[in-house]
Amino acid sequence: MTNGGRNGEENKNLMNGEAKAEPETFAQFLYNKDKGTVLGRTGTSWCQITVFYIIFYIFLSAFFIGCLSIFLRTLDPKVPRFYGKGTIIGVNPGVGYQPWLKENPDSTLIKFNLQDSKSWEPYVKQLDNYLSKYKNTNETRDCGASDNNDALETDTDTFPCRFDLGLFEKANCGAKDQYGYKSGKPCVAVSLNRLIGWRPVNYDDGSVPEEIKGRYKPGSITINCEGATSFDKEHLGKVKYIPETGIDGRYYPYVFVPSYQQPIAMVKFDTIPRNKLVIVECRAYASNIEHDISTRLGMVYFELFVEDKKPVAAPAA
């Protein structure tokens, strides 16, 4: 017998002299009748590993739920864990306005035609919806001129100050006057974003900005609206503020309570030109409100376009 023949016979045997097992096929891996295995495991082995993983994942889930429960207990549902300076919330309130149509959320254009009620009715409806929350006066209280919401921070039994919309009605910026949109003297509601614990800080004597010197009242947030460009400033016309001193500071600080009523001010554009687009820049003023044009900090922009022309009839189908 040649060396090649002897080597071939030796390769078929293990070192202990037993014959090598034939390579297992994929079908045999799936189910091996001789060994009684499925996917390489016997029934007993499958039972053992199944029980192990069931117990393992039960303990793992219990550990996760326990950690999550401990974490949630450290959170206050009314106050963010981190807020104020150095946090993403910050200390400088943003400025918002209404009406802002949800159907076109990316647009800051307020455009309507005096001769087409369908064009200005959506703005009236939006303001109706926005101001409807003030009709619920449950768990609120009347606050006098010297009262405020200071007690809300320490006394959970105190109700927040009730915000009265009557001032807007008297100035023809209420629902009965369609907020001025029907007459072409639109009113825009201006408010500050809610920041936990924030309240306006008064200007020092002599440091009140020129833009608001005649209207500034300590304790309030004065609103001032101007045209964004020289063209806009020229055509903006007469602007009326309701109240004249801006947002009343006695409704601060903001505290998370369900019945809290956010203070607002109305800006009425009495002589806005017809058929001209005017870009408006409104700023909120208090000593602790910063302004930054690049990030629009402490200010808000929107466009006004009041048309006065016969609406174009829709083509017949």
UniProtKB/Swiss-Prot annotation:
Q: Which GO terms describe its cellular component?
A: sodium:potassium-exchanging ATPase complex
Cytoplasmic membrane side:
1-50
Enumerate the PROSITE patterns for this protein: ATPASE_NA_K_BETA_1
Kindly list the GO molecular function terms attached to this UniProt entry: ATPase activator activity
Protein's UniProt keywords contain Mitochondrion: no
Keyword vocabulary terms for this entry: Cell membrane, Disulfide bond, Glycoprotein, Ion transport, Membrane, Potassium, Potassium transport, Signal-anchor, Sodium, Sodium transport, Sodium/potassium transport, Transmembrane, Transmembrane helix, Transport
Q: Name one GO biological process term.
A: sodium ion export across plasma membrane
What InterPro entries is this protein classified in?
Na/K_ATPase_sub_beta, Na/K_ATPase_sub_beta_sf
Glycan attachment residues as annotated in the record? N138
Spell out where the chain crosses the membrane.
51-71
Q: Which residues form a coiled coil?
A: none
Provide Lumenal-side residue ranges.
72-317
The membrane topology term of the UniProt record is: Single-pass type II membrane protein
Cystines in this chain: C173-C187, C225-C282
Q: How does it assemble?
A: The sodium/potassium-transporting ATPase is composed of a catalytic alpha subunit, an auxiliary non-catalytic beta subunit and an additional regulatory subunit.
Q: What does this protein do?
A: This is the non-catalytic component of the active enzyme, which catalyzes the hydrolysis of ATP coupled with the exchange of Na(+) and K(+) ions across the plasma membrane. The beta subunit regulates, through assembly of alpha/beta heterodimers, the number of sodium pumps transported to the plasma membrane. Implicated in genomic response to various soil bacteria that affects fitness, lifespan and brood size.
Similarity remark: Belongs to the X(+)/potassium ATPases subunit beta family.
Q: What is this protein identified as?
A: Probable sodium/potassium-transporting ATPase subunit beta-3
Organism whose genome encodes this protein = Caenorhabditis elegans
